Amino acid sequence: MAQASTRTSTTRAPLLVSFLFFYASKVNQLSIAIAGQDFVMVAADTRISSGFSILSREYSRTTKLTEKTVITSSGMVADIENLHKLLIAKVKTYQRQFKKSPSTESLAQLLGNTLYSRRFMPIYAFNLLCGLDAQGQGSVYGYDAIGSFDKLTYGVQGSGSQLGAPILDN
């Protein structure tokens, strides 16, 4: 006698979501930012890989938002692209409306609010927002996927952070 399947459609959705997050977390990447008295240094790798497959060697994880602010991200590439395009559009709208560029602090709060607004279906991107503040000092803001952020002296994001963080700690 054949037994009926106990799996329902409600058990498949969490499996799919967990698979997508597992797959996205296996993408090798690294973003590093260091803030100084009057500078910010940002570095990010350009490789997209999954397992043993290299999908691209020329992908830029860093996007210039204003003359004083850049963002670098690690995570799912589609979400990174979408987030960067959304932030660029919001910066252009701000510039058109107020006839000036937003400050690094304003963009830090904007990014946190944007990520938090998607907390129930998060944007799978771990970001470092870097720039010069109003006093001309370097600022690095580190984010998680749901918008929590903190101002840092240096930041490391991505699956390669286990290798990058000890170097910066010294």
PLM regions with names:
Residues M1-N170:
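Long, low-complexity N-terminal extensions
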